[in-house]
Amino acid sequence: MGMWSIGVGAVGAAAVALLLANTDMFLSKPRKAALEYLEDIDLKTLEKEPRTFKAKELWEKNGAVIMAVRRPGCFLCRAEAADLMSLKPKLDELGVPLYAVVKEQVKREVEDFQPYFKGEIFLDEKKKFYGPERRKMMFMGLIRLGVWYNSFRAWNGGFSGNLEGEGFILGGVFVIGSGKQGILLEHREKEFGDRVNPLSVLEAVKKIKLQTPASGRS
């Protein structure tokens, strides 16, 4: 009887733990980024002789859509990148560029990511685009049903990847208006494979006010 009670108790505890892991109760809440915070981020080009510049250059004239990639080798990140790339013809029509930032360069990970993301990619060494407060998902991600659903969807879409590089710091997607227009959309991953809604991205992009030479001087 005692062993039976212990067994039932253990199963019950495991069930409760599984239930709690699949709520958002224990997920760290993202803190919204201010435009001034993003503007001051130092980015590097990925050339042999890299150029360092302030991130605001990316959106100053025409706004921008920016993906903060959790890990280029992750098949879930590659699936989200492909989602964003499906918007590229419409973004080009609207005159809004699409960029990505990565937090590290590991082997050929960035090069191997480029078939899924054909926009320009920059290095954010200080991981500022992943802040202001970096959020991590550790092994709890392995028992979240949402992660399993996201994984199945990506696998079913034919995406594959590897385990190279840091992948616990969660990424996101930003739509930023031109000049001082501000952040029009800020999507922060709450779990692995939590993709932004492409329609939400397009809706935000349509609000961008492109700067003409005259408005840029005003």
Swiss-Prot record:
Please provide, alphabetically and separated by semicolons, the GO molecular function terms listed in this UniProt record.
antioxidant activity
Summed up, the tissue specificity of this protein is: Expressed in kidney, liver, skin, and brain. Widely expressed with highest levels detected in adipose tissue.
UniProt keyword list? Antioxidant, Cytoplasm, Redox-active center, Secreted
Full protein name: Peroxiredoxin-like 2A
Can you name the source organism? Mus musculus (Mouse)
Annotated Gene Ontology cellular component terms: extracellular region; mitochondrion
Further notes on this entry?
The active site cysteines correspond to the redox-active cysteines of peroxiredoxins.
Taxonomic superkingdom: Eukaryota
